[in-house]
Amino acid sequence: MLSLLSYDFMQRAFLAVIAMSLFSPVLGTFLILRRQSLMSDTLSHVSLSGVAFGLVLGISPTVSTIAIVLIAAVFLEYLRTVYKSFMEIGTAILMSTGLAVSLIVMSKGKSSSSMSLDQYLFGSIVTISEEQVLSLFVIAAVVLILTFLFLRPMYILTFDEDTAFVDGLPVRTMSILFNMVTGVAIALMIPAAGALLVSTIMVLPASIALRLGKNFKSVMLLASAIGFLGMVAGLYISYYVETPASASITIIFVTVFLLISLVRRFIK
């Protein structure tokens, strides 16, 4: 593994793995416990329209993606309040709308733009730039600081919104801000993980940790550790087997989840 780090692109990829393992499983834990695990898929699909606008208009896809995702995050919370008993309706509406808009925008662009969109669809952790790695560490710092400062309020909000409301917490504002932070994180992860697989890195490590952890904090720590080890293993395998890194990482997480689920079932 150390020999791989002699390459500059592998050094950047390894740093990106460290950054993503610090924040994506933390957000994933909240998403799962809030029964919003599909939100990561929804916002990643919506982000494609932001990428499309950026490529067609000739501006930074990252900037346009963040702008679109922030709007979608607010709208998603509105839909969640409208369809309280059917929250998946809001995610379905936004997901399909995001894909439709991206296809329409790209159809009006050049063929080279379509090729660039494919890079954002599947991502490539080994081709990300130093600026993109830095942006991942910035969002990691933001997520960790916010988690440290607002862990108790988010804990109450996650498990019982009614109690959070009675305690005087700004439930709607907190939910919107959480959606927005998650959206920005997804937008910054897309160049490395790809829009189609970004939810894997966010949700699967947290899903595995929930099978092993004994309390809320231990689940978060386990999720980050599992996320880091799984991504490093996927990076290592993809280099030697010559497979896409994001796909290799996904297979590893799914395999670990299935193995742990089977072991726990037989133990019981």
What are these regions (language model features)?
Residues 145-178:
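Membrane-helix/interface signature in polytopic inner-membrane proteins
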Residues 46-56, 94-105, 123, 127, ...:
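Small-residue-rich segments of transmembrane alpha-helices in multi-pass membrane proteins
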Residues 246-268:
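Cytosolic-side transmembrane-helix boundaries in multi-pass membrane proteins
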Residues 10-12, 91-150:
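Transmembrane helix-bundle core of multi-pass membrane transporters
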Residues 29-112, 209-221, 240-241, 265-266:
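Short loop segments and helix-boundary regions at transmembrane helix junctions
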Residues 14-19, 62-67, 90-93, 133-138, ...:
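Hydrophobic alpha-helical transmembrane segments
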Residues 192, 198-247:
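Transmembrane alpha-helical segments in multi-pass inner-membrane proteins
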Residues 1-22:
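Membrane-interfacial amphipathic/re-entrant helices at transmembrane-helix boundaries
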